[in-house]
Amino acid sequence: MPMRPHFHCKAALLALAIASLAGCASTPAEPVPFKEVPQARIVQPGYTEPGTGLVAVDVRRERSRDVIVRFRDALVYVDGEQVTDLMNGEHVVFYLSPGVHRIGVSTQFDPVVEMRFTVTADTRYTNRASVTFDGDHGIALRRVAQ
């Protein structure tokens, strides 16, 4: 049976190749910080300027590898006014008075998704919202817990 030793040789070479490739496995990359939205894309600058008595609210567009949504801009609204748009991996900080505000997002394909957002200086709560896309590529907005 001359074929049997040849088979064992191939199996040994395959095992050696797999073992050597497993040693080269990459480690996950460190998380990349969110980029700030350029000033040129802020259409209502009053919401992005700090002031006395105002509380910082961070709205972040989570990164997506999905090509369908990756290059879509997400329009961001505060109390019904469009303030800016967020691209993949960007964030914007709004300075809002304490109380209830409406934060909304949309794309050219989605209607405005809005949420009531209670802004508070109380450090037990986070003033951060996250913009994501669901499995059907629809835009979503949620408050992020601390």
Say what each PLM segment does.
Residues 7-14:
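Sec-dependent signal peptide recognition
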Residues 2-5, 24-146:
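Short loop/turn and low-complexity linker motifs enriched in small/turn-promoting residues
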